[in-house]
Amino acid sequence: MVKFKQTEEIEKIMTNLEQVRNIGTLAHVDHGKTTLSDSLLLAAGMISPKVAGKALALDYVEIEQLRQMTVKAANVSLYHERGGKPYVINLVDTPGHVDFTGHVTRSLRVMDGAIVVVDAVEGIMTQTETVVRQALEEMVRPLLYINKIDRLIRELRLSPQEVLQRLLNIIKDFNMLIDIHASPSVKNEWKVDPNKGQVAFGAALHKWGFTLPIMQKKGFKFSNIVETYERGGEAIEELARELPLYEAILNMVVDHIPNPKVAQKYRIPKIWKGDLDSEVGRSMLECDPNGPTVLCVSKTIVDPHAGLVATGRVFSGVIYEGETVYLLGAKENGKILQVSLYMGPYREIISRVSAGNIAAVLGLEHARAGETIVDISLKGAMVPFERLRYISEPVVTIAIEPIHSKDLPRLIDTLRKMAIEDPTLRIKINEETGEYLISGMGQLHLEIALWDLNQRTGGLEVKTTPPIVMYRETIRVASKMFEGKSPNKHNRVMFIVEPLNEETLKLLAEGKVFEDQEWRERARILREYADWDADEARGIWAIDEHFNILVDTSKGIQYLKDIKDHIINGFRWCVDEGPLAKEPCRGIKVKLVDAVVHEDPAHRGPAQIIPATKDAIFAGILSARPTLLEPILKIEVKIPQEQIAGVMKALNTRRGKIVSIEQTGYLNIVRGEIPVAETLDLATDMRSLTSGKAFWATEFLKWSPVPENMLHEIIARIRERKGLPPNIPRVVFNPDGSVAIKS
């Protein structure tokens, strides 16, 4: 039996890596991850048996309890005994809703294995596929837990034979995901086999579960479970005593998830691109507590009393109170003021945490998710971890302002803290209107951000606009060369703009090409995989967050290096707010072709170079058949046969497109695409058109050109909302051939 253990005992076991497991729970929304976590906390004695299954203890943010869904990733260290041996299981509970995949991305970095929770009725859903794919990209081993088996018996009234067939289908679908997305080196080994105890079955709400080895050992048959539900009441409670869920899950974790020492050998080459033969490389591969300190931050929160708390995994060395470290991203030294373990919402202070474990540290005010923190001796010699790639990007925005202007400083301060904790939430001030813009992954993301704001400020009164869809500006053809002249007429810059090819956009989206990458490596990748010219690939000056690239293709220009930063600033200014509607640009290559620079520094400052750059780049964009891109979602609907017409109607009336319809047993799966702009009240429609019988989910798919017949109307609407003149700016040629942009 599992007993409650104090922090000191957990601390003792943590140094023996054979007895440590770092795992997370992953799933589609509402498939039962947090309810499963409650059963695991019950095992550790952290919540009472009465409330397990209903407590949602890891959903300790109040809104998570209200909505019954997890919005942030929570951490907890559990104690478990297996075969008379004690183990520490560091558990991360992650959100399943598509709007919160950012939290999942960050959590995966610290895990070695994941329990993927799948609802027995709904099966593998879109989000399940996304999180399994993300896990496999980070070399995190997935195991399967099929939850809510009681629904097959009670709601669908399936016979034991039909239940078995349903479970086998889910296992087959799960293994297919591993076949498609896993690295060839682990593909066969990581497919799950129920006979080996790599799949658990159960009902988290009723706290029972089993693996086939447990079933055989205890002499249970599946028909016994069907009979138990027929009897109901006390019999179900007895089942939870006979087959406790935590035992099935934690035994499966201990037996089939590798310990950190084993896992880091194959995970480090995947998530860290430094020299594996260096001292720090070898130390991380070996998960060596005697090596130099390396901590990768997966999550930051701003504690109202303690300040910024950074949680992450120690990949090498030991992290301890008073240690001086270096933050690679923030490029600064820091001092660790306190080290602790997470026990759900509580932090238990301990003196040190060694390699292979998850720690929370205080004192590093500028640490952010994805930060690499290292021993001070590695300053200047350490390569950071692969950057965290977020599957989606913000596509919906709202404007917010305080009702009372005296509250503005408090609003700004709170929004700043929220953006630190959730890097996928973008906060921006609109200088012209004084509004603050909050952009998120979807409506739910924004609703929860507003609720969070309200809680943190004690009910600060604010005005918000309805959700607005975000667009991107792009071009369809290459422009000719345009010349911009500085206001003092002493400097000239010449640019061409052209669309980036699909291969380049793919490399940018996959994080294989980025701004602060070693330039030779980046040039090689662009030449080999995106057909770039060698000189252009070497001449990249800047890459912005929306995938626009500035390239210097000029030759032998005097004083060019003195104005390089001003040109980069002008480029960023242009692509941050394009000429059509001041929306961010996407997929544009801007080439500096030539320049004439004044010899006197006083005549070539930013006030001269930036306007010239802006005029020439905007002229290029406006002449290259500019258009808007809108965000498109992938939608998957699981529905009984008789309700398919309702789904088709809901999609067809909203510019949606049906990609495929597939029959799986008694449910049909409709897969399609739909613009975000058409989904703002889709839930209501979907409920009424399908009599509430549709299980559906969406996920960001791509940016796609707005239909030509809607383009001008959308541009006009955005310009009006932003208080811009109704007409798009135009290019005016000066007598000397240079250009100016006129409103």
PLM region spans:
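P-loop NTPase switch module centered on the Walker A-proximal segment
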Residues: M1-V110, A114-V117, L156-S159, Q165, ...
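P-loop NTPase catalytic nucleotide-binding module
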Residues: M1-V29, Q127-S298, D303
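Structured, non-catalytic alpha/beta "coupling" segments that mediate domain-domain communication
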Residues: T35, R241-V262, I358-S377
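Short hydrophobic beta-strand that contains or immediately precedes a catalytic carboxylate
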Residues: L91-V92, A200-F201, I438-S439
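A conserved hydrophobic secondary-structure block that centers on an alpha-helix together
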Residues: T94, I115, A120-G123, R426-K428
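Short glycine-/polar-rich loops that comprise or flank the Walker A/P-loop
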Residues: V110-G113, E138-P142, P194-G197, V395, ...
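Accessory interaction regions appended to the cores of large information-processing enzymes
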Residues: P160, L164, D173-I178, S185-E189, ...
